[in-house]
Amino acid sequence: MNIIDRFEQENISKRTANKKIPDFEAGDTVKVTVKIIDRSIEKDGKEKLTERFQAYEGVVIAKRNRGITSSFLVRKISHGEGVERRFMTYSPIVHSIDVVKYGVVCRAKLYYLRNRSGKSARIKERHIPIAKTKAAKA
């Protein structure tokens, strides 16, 4: 293992120390909670920073596993328009990742969903036995 790989592994372990990243893949529906920092200037000229959390729920259409620069692309339909957002897996901005539904797909990248709407854009649900999910949570 060279120096760069060791540095990446140390960084990944530091960033995942206080949060758990579940196993998910393309086709799964995830809920990503993101930390948003709002900056405003008060009347007296002082700068005020406020933090809030925002949830983004959608289907993972691509996942890129590249060490510390790993990312995944989530697509959702908002007010009739398709919205895609790429999240860095180990970013400090990503507060939590929860898998809502597991999907069954035969592709690693689901870019074809961009051209589909309605029933043709649906993904079959993969059912996982209750014993496995309870053991994973414990």
From Swiss-Prot:
Gene Ontology BP term (one): translation
Superkingdom of this protein's organism: Bacteria
Residues making up the signal peptide according to the UniProt record: none
Keyword Ribosomal protein found: yes
Alphabetic keyword roster: Ribonucleoprotein, Ribosomal protein
A Pfam family this chain is assigned to: Ribosomal_L19
Protein name: Large ribosomal subunit protein bL19
Gene: rplS
Residues that span the membrane, as ranges: none
Native organism taxonomy: Bacteria, Pseudomonadati, Pseudomonadota, Alphaproteobacteria, Rickettsiales
PANTHER family noted in UniProt: LARGE RIBOSOMAL SUBUNIT PROTEIN BL19M, RIBOSOMAL PROTEIN L19
Annotated GO MF terms: structural constituent of ribosome
Family: Belongs to the bacterial ribosomal protein bL19 family.
InterPro entries for this protein: Ribosomal_bL19 (IPR001857), Ribosomal_bL19_sf (IPR038657), Translation_prot_SH3-like_sf (IPR008991)
Ribosomal protein keyword on record: yes
GO cellular component: cytosolic large ribosomal subunit
Role played: This protein is located at the 30S-50S ribosomal subunit interface and may play a role in the structure and function of the aminoacyl-tRNA binding site.
